[in-house]
Amino acid sequence: MAFEFGRTIYNATLGQALGKLTHMRQSTEWKNAFLIKKVSDRNAELKRIQKKYGLNEFGLGDMAANHRKASGKTNLIGFTEAKFIGFTVWRALERYIYAKGGRPRFKTKRRGLHSMYCCGNRGIIWKPQLQSVVWRGYRFPALVKHTAYFQEALGSEDSPRQVKICRIVRRILNCRERWFVQLVMVGLPPVRHVYAPKSETIGLDIGPSKVAMVSPNFAGFTFLSPYGEIPWAKIRNLRRKMARSLRAMNPDNYEPSGATKKGAREWKRSNHYEKLLRELADLYRRAAETRKRDHGALINSIFEQAGTVNLETISYRSYQRNFGRSAQRQASKLFVQRLKRKAESAALTVNELDTRKLRMSQYDHKTQTYTRKPLQQRWHSLGGSDTLVSRDIYSALLACCVKNGEHDPVSIERCWQAVEHQLKSAGFVRDIKLPKGPDRERFLSRLVRDPSPGFTSEAVQTKIFRVRSDVRPSRSFQTCFVGKAADISESPE
């Protein structure tokens, strides 16, 4: 009931704020402010006009509090919670005002409000002695994991940590509503992972589904999300059931041929359709959560090896066009975004290299020349010899050794000597007698696209990712780590 009332306050505040924004942009003083030539004076005038219309964080907070008071339902939500709902509206509206996001949308009753929070342990109060949340006179016990991490994060019963933000979150898990409490505590969080210093460097070569990693003492080649499989067959069956349900409930919305009628139509949804819709959403949620967990574990393993990460700038839109399902399942762009965010929070470095200038897939440090290769050729002949190295691994090695935006052949050779033996053991480097002449390129293109893994996916899951997945893979993943992160005493397949 309180969350539904919070949704109405959110929509009322957003509607009023959008109306004020329209009036402000149509006003004469707003248009005249853009005629001011000096940038600092123009920005100051625009900010003054915006404050006059109440379009700032505290203005929308007061607006939401007034809507709460006028509703006559002050017993459902407190003054503090209403103000923070206004702050949430401002964060959405601010992106729209400064052209960093689209027009904010109203929250429907079906979608609802997902969270409510308060700062300073007021309104929504966390009681550490009771391990409970107290809100509007009700006490809600929390199920807290009794682990060392939670004990250190929350503090002891005698000296609990001060709560900065207490947030109640509503989630749909397994087609049921679940309620969680999120706490932001004062101070530094407990250390879960010890990251390497920034003096250590690792190079990444990120593809639509896999990532190659090379540093002077570590090399790896794995899927971005080994267990982030999307159950396409189940999704297809659910969508067919939903389509049949819609046809049964809305026969007047279809032509005799079976096509939907053009124009605006009113669709009736049965309870069975709503149940199928929740099941479909839960399938996508499971895949997204598994993908997020795999990305986080892989990022932690990367930063445990090196504090500086070099990678090429990539056109992720091209991946979506050419490798649609792989891009959706593995989410390489999301992986890079989380990698940058983790590096920023941990005071580490992620360097994006110029792809057009360095041309990793074409360069050969032995001859210091550039040779274009077709996409299907996944092996590189090192210096024109009979030594073949995986194209992805070699690109990651080149990225690791970039100095001042240029290739450094001396550093590349030193790194190559350090990891060559391990790469041979894992099958990423091969010595094959190659034919000469035009048959050479044809032979390279016909080689297996990916090398055989040096270790089983179960071993990598145990040693690298450290957690068990709730989604079992439906195919055999080729995953390999060599160097520090894996036991290289095992013999390759």
Task: List each model region and its residues.
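A generic secondary-structure signal for well-formed alpha-helical elements
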Residues: 10-21, 93-100, 210, 407
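Stable alpha-helical structural segments in soluble proteins, enriched in small hydrophobic residues
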Residues: 2, 9, 13, 81-92, ...
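Positively charged, helix-rich recognition surfaces that bind polyanionic ligands
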Residues: 179-493
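Acidic carboxylate diad motif detector
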Residues: 35-174, 329, 333
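Amphipathic alpha-helical surface "interface" segments used
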Residues: 29-43, 104-122, 261-262, 268, ...
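Detector for conserved single-position "signature" residues within domains
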Residues: 2-53
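Residue-level detector of alpha-helical segments with a strong bias toward transmembrane helices
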Residues: 21, 111-115, 215, 402
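Short, flexible helical or helix-coil boundary motifs
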Residues: 25-28, 41-46, 53-57, 67, ...
